[in-house]
């Protein structure tokens, strides 16, 4: 399920690095994580929805790339982000 505008704005406000920041890796990873969590519930009910599963895998891969980039550029920001989001690693 897609995020509502209010929940997306709240996530951006929570994870932004500077005022008006919507494109930092932290914000992008947070938005992808919430979308992924929403889709996981969908797949519990719709096991054979392979078309949407492809989109889920694409989001997971994009999040992984952003996390790898952040880990390479600034390890402290990376560790604080995964702790805040509760991601494994």
Curated annotation (Swiss-Prot):
CDD domains: Ribosomal_S15p_S13e. Signal peptide: none annotated. GO terms for cellular component: cytosolic small ribosomal subunit. It comes from the Bacteria. Keywords: Ribonucleoprotein, Ribosomal protein, RNA-binding, rRNA-binding. InterPro entries: Ribosomal_uS15 (IPR000589), Ribosomal_uS15_bac-type (IPR005290), uS15_NS1_RNA-bd_sf (IPR009068). Part of the 30S ribosomal subunit. Forms a bridge to the 50S subunit in the 70S ribosome, contacting the 23S rRNA. This is Small ribosomal subunit protein uS15. It comes from Marinomonas sp. (strain MWYL1). The gene is rpsO.
């Amino acid at each position: 399920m897609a995020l509502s505008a209010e929940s997306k704005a709240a996530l951006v406000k929570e994870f932004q690095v500077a005022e008006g920041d919507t494109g930092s890796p932290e914000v992008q990873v947070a938005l992808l994580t919430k979308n992924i969590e929403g889709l996981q519930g969908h797949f519990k009910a719709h096991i054979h929805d392979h078309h949407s599963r492809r989109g889920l895998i694409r989001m997971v891969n994009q999040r992984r790339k952003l996390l790898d980039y952040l880990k390479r550029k600034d390890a402290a920001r990376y560790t604080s982000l995964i702790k805040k989001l509760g991601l494994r690693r």
